Amino acid sequence: MKCFLICGSKKEPISINGTPNVVKSKYFEGDVKVRLRDYETPDEEYFEQSNDTCSIMIRGRFLPTESTLTADDILFGNQFEKPLRDVLPMGSNLLMKGLQYVDPSIEFDLYCDQPWAFSPFFATMTKMQVSDALLPMEYFEDHSSRRSQMQQQVIRQESSIDPNKYILADFCNPFFNPSTLSISIPYTKMSFSIKNYYNGQPLRYFCKTRDGNVIFAVEFDL
């Protein structure tokens, strides 16, 4: 398992459960840290407090742009370079329905030539804090109603992103385990290995603007 941060033309290794990587782009500056449960170098302090199997933690601020960005303008999710329709396992539709239950704002097309699944960044992040200064990249709880509020497009469109505020966001879940290449379908007891369906493509999580400008990406070479 290898992991990389892609920012512009740069592609650099990510030390899983290690030191965060710096992100500096036109739209965002900050850090990204990837954690995996049961990886070679464990992060016991984080996973002792969580039942999640993976975490992409993002810290920093969105930068000023010519036009004011709103919470509806930033997306986060997956995109593939080649079709998946011939290798998708049985249960894929059930998996996506489960994901829609967790994140009603997700949109996807798994059967096109470049399959994708994206949600608004501020709606899909599992946990998030906003502060006037940088927060430590540690485990934290989020009991706010932010996720349910941000599922509503009108609220996202009315929520301007303040470039003077710092976010700490954690995209974490117990459903996907990159270390074992297994997926659990949310709120069911069903799980399956994707090893037999893997066609060699890297798994990439993109943070991008709604009009298609990539801010950064985290790549897992499975």
UniProtKB/Swiss-Prot annotation:
Is NADP there in the keyword field?
no
Q: Where in the cell is it found?
A: Cytoplasm; Nucleus
The protein's matches in Pfam families, at most eight in alphabetical order, are given as: Duc1
Does NAD count among this protein's keywords?
Answer: no
What name has this protein been given in UniProt? DUF1769 family protein
Q: What is its main location?
A: cytoplasm
Organism, by scientific name, is Schizosaccharomyces pombe (strain 972 / ATCC 24843) (Fission yeast)
User: What PANTHER family does UniProt report for this protein, alphabetically?
Assistant: UPF0590 PROTEIN C409.17C
Q: Which family does it belong to?
A: Belongs to the UPF0590 family.
Which keywords does the record carry? Cytoplasm, Nucleus
- Looking at the UniProt record for this protein, which Gene Ontology cellular component terms does it annotate, in alphabetical order? cytosol; nucleus
